[in-house]
Amino acid sequence: MSKILIRGAKVLGGEPQDVLIDGETIAEVGNGLSAEGATVVEADGKILLPGLVDLHTHLREPGREDSETVLTGTRAAASGGFTAVFAMANTFPVADTAGVVEQVWRLGKESGYCDVQPIGAVTVGLEGKQLSELGAMHDSAAGVTVFSDDGKCVDDAVIMRRALEYVKAFGGVVAQHAQEPRLTEGAQMNEGIVSAELGLGGWPSVAEESIIARDVLLAEHVGSRVHICHLSTAGSVEIVRWAKSRGIDVTAEVTPHHLLLTDELVRSYNPVYKVNPPLRTERDVLALREALADGTIDIVATDHAPHPHEDKDCEWAAAAMGMVGLETALSVVQQTMVETGLLDWAGVAERMSVKPARIGSLEGHGRPIAAGEPANLTLVDSAYRGVVDPAGFASRSRNTPYEGRELPGRVTHTFLRGRATVVDGKLA
């Protein structure tokens, strides 16, 4: 078995240490380590984190391979420091059966760049009318534990209650895309001053907040787990904070773009800023950062949503919603959370590795950097500064809102069970 010696890495941002990998496992962590025949990686004070875990990606395969494939998506994930991603169910066909989730799971196994855990649809065809084969997907080779109709809201309260009751039997979780559909008909951006000035249909905060309020109460009533996807408003933060104070089993995520970007960018009418949920106000952005720091929001998830050029190179109203995010996520978190003093690197690891793996019941990821643990690791050059150029992305799509923007930090190495998937910032 191959050995790799990472020399002088700041484990979780602490004092420099050496980490010896033997095969798929961390063999030793300490100072002055040596190993005969080992490949040496000189970390030179770079930050060593457990491999990142993304609870919310859209890999588009099967059905929209023009946007992304499991292979290109996992290459993008590895480039961004991720060793595991959860793939949303809004594919063609929809991942609402054991057969489709097993297909996605097997494609992930074949890619070899990171682990892929499929998310099963809550309802058949994402239509919100009939529960999918939740038990069959859980019992399949893919072992699905997270279920979501993401892209659409499970807006029927009875269906949502039944889903929560069903997944409770095997410790699963329903991940809700909180968007009351009637309140967002014709909506194009956040409802507020900017939407009024631009004459674009407004997307009110209450459309998100009302669903979250309903679903945390349903979860309390059923005694089940609910996860709220991509929180985007200060009001949503307050509802989740209240629910947690009552002991309700709710977790929540925020995307990197909602930690940095605001609806003021929509004044450009550039569809790259069109996303669901929409970019909100500066007040919302600051509330989301504080909530991520204090634990009200549990994790960062990218909501990586690739689209081909033609789906974004059009007028605003006709453009698809979504942004790619796997290759820039850690940099945005460094800028918004670490460099502002809201989180240290141990806190980043907790929110981008440990907790996502825990919420998704994913074994072998989000583990301590210690002897005997799986060697899923990410090495980050936090001193690096660079301008985002989507031409260099591993993703098949280029719809990033950060093109031309300087961001800090760069993943130099990613290790999946002891095998380097990224070396010196390039895919291995």
Task: Name each model-derived stretch.
Residues E315-A318, A371-K426:
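C-terminal cap of metal-dependent C-N hydrolases
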Residues L131-V300:
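Histidine/acidic residue-rich metal-binding segments in metalloenzymes
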Residues E197-R225, V272, A293, D298-V300, ...:
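His/Asp/Glu-enriched, well-ordered alpha-helical/loop segment
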Residues K46-S111:
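Metal-associated gating/positioning segment near the N- to mid-region
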Residues M1-P50:
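Histidine-rich, glycine-flanked metal-binding segment
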Residues R106-V122:
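A glycine-rich helix N-cap at a beta->alpha junction
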Residues L55-E68, A89-T91, D96, Q117-Q130, ...:
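Active-site mouth loops of central-metabolism enzymes
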Residues A9, E24, G45, H56, ...:
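Divalent metal-coordination and catalytic microenvironments
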